[in-house]
Amino acid sequence: MSFFENTRKPVGLGGKIMVAMMNFGHSAMAEWGLSFLQPAPDAMVLDCGCGGGANIKTLLKLCPNGKVQGIDYSAVSVEKTRKVNAGAIAAGRCTVQQASVAELPFEAEQFDVVTAFETVYFWPELAQNFREVYRVLKPGGIFFICNEANGETAKDDKWTQIIDGMAIYTDTALKEYLEKAGFCQIQSHKNKKGWLCVTAQKR
């Protein structure tokens, strides 16, 4: 397995290095994307594909009276996220578990917000996975997607060739999947760096 395969599912030493790099390398994009999200101070949030845990730490600050849960199907990512957010976990404001978006381990209508930073590229069945997100969101809840690649630049093709199982979606493609899953009020934002943020609301 090449080092870059760890972007999909971090494992071993290479995976530990990758999740540490994720926390630093994606911070500017995450900050930009979160400018389009205004969660309530007491929001219940789920971060799907929590990677190195930095975004959960930020979400906990944005929701000082809320709780944030995280899932990742990489044991390395779960371990790192728990370390980064150990204080919040001890305080009962955060839980992190190994799980897949294909079958979220939550009851229906639990969350006000579900976030997905740099992860939908690797989701196995986007249509079904979006329906799972829809299921666990409360009515009126927000699904937030933030990607460094918007599917419209030459460099995007390079990454899909290097990383097996990676698919980069345009905002138009994501909107189609979201609408089929039942979402409404879909909005997309792009910048000159090619970053993409999409928000969608559960009916």
Residue ranges and their predicted role:
Residues 40, 90-91, 184:
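Conserved H-loop
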